Amino acid sequence: MGKLRVTYVKSAIGYARDQKETLAALGLRRLNQSVLKPDNPSVRGMLFKVQHLVKVEEVEDEVQA
């Protein structure tokens, strides 16, 4: 499976507490911060919840020799 690059692009001020907790669970603390996450249903569910606050890009796995 691939990976997802998740970038925090919009402030969570004024949004529900559970959305702020979801951002923290994804490892996002500051605006414009990016993290790599595995592409699985659990992560996709979290991203669906905060889709209006983040930008998601698919990243190909690197080949390890």
UniProtKB/Swiss-Prot annotation:
UniProt-listed GO biological process terms: translation
Keyword Ribonucleoprotein: yes
UniProt KW Ribosomal protein keyword: yes
Gene3D superfamilies on file: Ribosomal protein L30, ferredoxin-like fold domain (3.30.1390.20)
Protein name: Large ribosomal subunit protein uL30
An example Gene Ontology CC term for this record: cytosolic large ribosomal subunit
Family assignment from sequence similarity: Belongs to the universal ribosomal protein uL30 family.
Subunit structure: Part of the 50S ribosomal subunit.
GO molecular function, one term: structural constituent of ribosome
CDD domains for this protein: Ribosomal_L30
InterPro entries hit by this protein: Ribo_uL30_ferredoxin-like_sf (IPR036919), Ribosomal_uL30_bac-type (IPR005996), Ribosomal_uL30_CS (IPR018038), Ribosomal_uL30_ferredoxin-like (IPR016082)
Alphabetic keyword roster: Ribonucleoprotein, Ribosomal protein
